[in-house]
Amino acid sequence: MNDSAKLNGHANLRIPDFSIVIPVYFNEGSLFATMDALNTQVLSRNDGLQGEVIFIDDGSKDQSLSELLAIKSNFPHLVRIIKLTRNFGQVSAVRAGFAHARGRCVIVISADGQDPPELMNNMLHSHFTEGNQIVICTREGREESVFRKLTSDIFYGLMRKLSFHSMPDGGFDYFLLGRWALDEMLSNDEANPFLQGQILWLGYDTKFIGYTRRERKIGQSRWTFGKKLTYLLDGILGYSYFPIRIVSFTGLLFALLGFFYAVVVLINWIVNGSLVQGWTPLMIVILVLGGLQLLTLGLIGEYLWRTLDQVKHRKPYVVDHIYD
């Protein structure tokens, strides 16, 4: 049965006012606590607003799915589970949640317990009362290790300098999108999306709410340095002309240096009747220019690979099963 047919089964139910999307990857130890916090601090506190919770199992190999099914048995009409065939990455999991959300707005929060669920009450008020299409919770502080703080500051600092000047200093992955903004996100079929960049690019009225990200109590992060680096490249190469521009300026600089060096050699030959001898100057020039050429080819290759990925129109995820 396809996804649309499965969704039609909800035609006789009231459309939720908001959908909470939670990507899950090796989070077996924190899922019950997350759902309990959502139920007591958000779902039961917003009279007149009906919500739904969508968990996306992104190919977890632990007992996350079993825990989710147990949670659903306790909240059969409130919880939905989207199981992907394998691990497609957090961004793809969030996009799967977007596609299956039925609410008038959608809130994305992690399953690790580091983001305070009670902020959703302020987010919902900002959207339904103040009319903001986008509400972003920004990390003004982090109860994390020095290394994680440093890498995060470097990551989002580069994004702020090179691609998105409106990127909050601490970045974000806890946010609300109104239905207009969500539909725009769904219509974007970018192959290697930088999710935060897409949200900022939309340009809708946005409210920022600051908070301190809590220390992780259960489990460990699967957001490795390699994944961060790949995501950083997606954000820079997909939304900034800086890499190509810096290569162009570097090429121009070395061309000018080569021209002036040729003039110096010519003057030396005219005045002294001798040319510069030896392998050292030649090898320096060859190695420097060769390295720059390889660097430039690598950069072009990154752009070409992303272009190839885009024209394939490959699905960002594959749904294995939907537990409605």
Please identify what each model-predicted range represents.
Residues 40, 44, 70, 74, ...:
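Conserved amphipathic alpha-helical interaction elements at protein-protein interfaces in regulatory
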Residues 23, 84-86, 109, 175, ...:
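Short conserved micro-motifs on helix faces and helix-strand junctions that flank
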